[in-house]
Amino acid sequence: MMQESGTEAANGTAHQNGAPPSVEGHREVRSKSTTPSSDITASDIINFQQHQALQVARQILLQQQQQSSVHKSPKNNDKQPATQVPVSVAMMTPQVITPQQMQQILQHQVLSPQQLQLLLQQQQALMLQQQLQEFYKKQQEQLHLQLIQQQHGSKQQSKEVSAQQLAFQQQLLQVQQLQQQHLLSLQRQGLLSIQPNQTLPLHTLTQGMIPAELQQLWKEVTNSHVKEENSVTNNGHRGLDLSSPSPVPLKNHNQHGSTNGQYISHSLKREGSTLDDHSPHSHPLYGHGVCKWPGCEAVFEDFQSFLKHLNNEHALDDRSTAQCRVQMQVVQQLELQLAKDKERLQAMMTHLHVKSTEPKPTPQPLNLVSNVALSKTAPAASPPLSLPQTPTTPTAPLTPLSQTHSVITPTSLHSVGPIRRRYSDKYNMPISPDIVQNKEFYMNAEVRPPFTYASLIRQAILESPEKQLTLNEIYNWFTRMFAYFRRNAATWKNAVRHNLSLHKCFVRVENVKGAVWTVDELEFQKRRPQKISGSPALVKNIHTTLGYGPALSAAFQASMAENIPLYTTASIGSPTLNSLASVIREEMNGAMDHGNSNGSDSSPGRSPLPAMHHISVKEEPMDPEEHEGPLSLVTTANHSPDFDHHRDYEDDHGTEDML
């Protein structure tokens, strides 16, 4: 009240001097900064104007309620005077600056640019108040005429009056919020200094909002508010009171309120459209007869009782506002978690679909000594296997075969030439379950499938309805099932043609369509590895030459026999066996001193080829028909690296070798 009296005194002084109050106030601040009048700021003036507008609105609403009560008792109809505009409303009109006064201010440069901008914004607020006053007068005239007509009217006319009164309330609240928005914008720009004891009404609802958003907000709220108020007014559950605004728009404010001054405008639009789409008996906070307000969970028999509960228990108060803020924080946390999960999923998909350019570090392979210890506990019939390691192997699906081990590991032979390791054809393990289980992975990721060309060709033919395919159909199956074969077509297609022509299990049949390829299963099974032919003393000779003696179990002897199928009796006792023993002994002794990751990659293009000991070890057995004579496991020390390209018909190019 002291601020209001001081403001009125300042306004009176300004009117007597013939200058606007805001300009006079600024002059006093600049000339007499030490006087008590400098405490009166523009925020005080705006707060006083808002207080006056609020009093006017309350007086008008009280008069309207009295008129409505008089309308209910017809005996006192003649005694009710007409509604008039209070005098306090007319007192605010002379504060508008005339064009002549504005020109004088600009010529004399009385105000600084910031003060001039503040003055203009204040004048805009005053113009809005004048428009509201004119609206008051029109509404009062219309209400007075309608009250006279309602004495002989019907209930339908009373509904229209209630709707107009509701519109009047909304216009009043809209003007108040616009004024408050101007004040907050001035505060952000540093043009106003709000004292701690000064209150900012509707601060949490309007902070961070621009006038366009505010108009859109009230446009949406008004539509839903009019619908709700019409239904509630018809049932007679509530009256019109400015001090207790309607729960419907305030609920929307709570749901889309501000957290730390940030207003979510797109959520408001989405919520408004969602509420419009709901059926008359559905509500986002109502489901299966239970109130979904956080912490409520009250049970209701019908939708109308839920609406009563929502309007009464969850109206705008401190508790509901706090619950709404908590819910907003929960939603924000969930959105952050969702964003993190989406980013993680995108990274996973990118990693799986894009082939890595850097080789991944592979797990430390087991050396020969550890395999000897493992082979003692393993069954003698289980052959040692190894899953090929490629740069993309860590992303490939791991089958049970990945848990087996190799006797001669890539690390232990890092200085040895190309090593071919395949498990599907050698150990009679079908590739159908693996392809079916990891079909989507092979179709999308550029990962080299761990199968031989012969196995893939056989699988393609067996999957066909007629168990026969043309060469072009085989090509199409490769590109359809494996993303790896959608590039470098010239390389792998040449390898497919070599396998079809060299393996006896693939039979070429001429028919009406042309030449088709079929599979001879009996011949395909003959390609399985054979036991070492010749004297059984070969195994004993091998492990005694290596120097391990009785440390090698029977299972390891069988493993050695499996991994050296090309060794025949012709090579027994030859000097090459002693050379093999010395080389393997040297490599085994130095295997623990270095773990070169490049050695784990068996591709010829990535394996180091030193000047000495170019040894090519091939585990896959080849048919005797494919060679001109018996081949020894170990070649000469100066063996050419091109040996594999001439001998290995399954892979035409070393860089595209199937692992």
UniProtKB/Swiss-Prot annotation:
Tissue: Shows complex and dynamic expression during early embryonic development. Prominent in many regions of the developing central nervous system, particularly in midbrain-hindbrain boundary, hindbrain and spinal cord. Strongly expressed in the retina, ear, branchial arches, hatching gland, heart, pronephric duct, gut, proctodeum, pectoral fin and swim bladder.
Pfam families: Forkhead, FOXP-CC
Residue ranges, compositional bias (Polar residues): 1-16, 32-41, 595-605
Primary localisation category: nucleus
Zinc finger (C2H2-type): 289-314
Residue stretches of biased makeup (Low complexity): 387-404
Role description: Transcriptional repressor.
DNA-binding region: 448-538
Compositional bias (Basic and acidic residues): 641-659
Region (Disordered): 1-41, 229-263, 379-413, 590-659
GO biological process terms on file: regulation of transcription by RNA polymerase II
Region of interest (CTBP1-binding), ranges: 365-369
GO cellular component terms, semicolon-separated: nucleus
GO MF term (any one): DNA-binding transcription repressor activity, RNA polymerase II-specific
Gene3D superfamilies: 1.20.5.340, Winged helix-like DNA-binding domain superfamily/Winged helix DNA-binding domain
Localization in the cell: Nucleus
Name recorded for this polypeptide: Forkhead box protein P1-B
SUPFAM superfamilies on file: Winged helix' DNA-binding domain
UniProt remark on domains: The leucine-zipper is required for dimerization and transcriptional repression.
Keywords: DNA-binding, Metal-binding, Nucleus, Repressor, Transcription, Transcription regulation, Zinc, Zinc-finger
Renumbered residue ranges of the record's region Leucine-zipper: 331-352
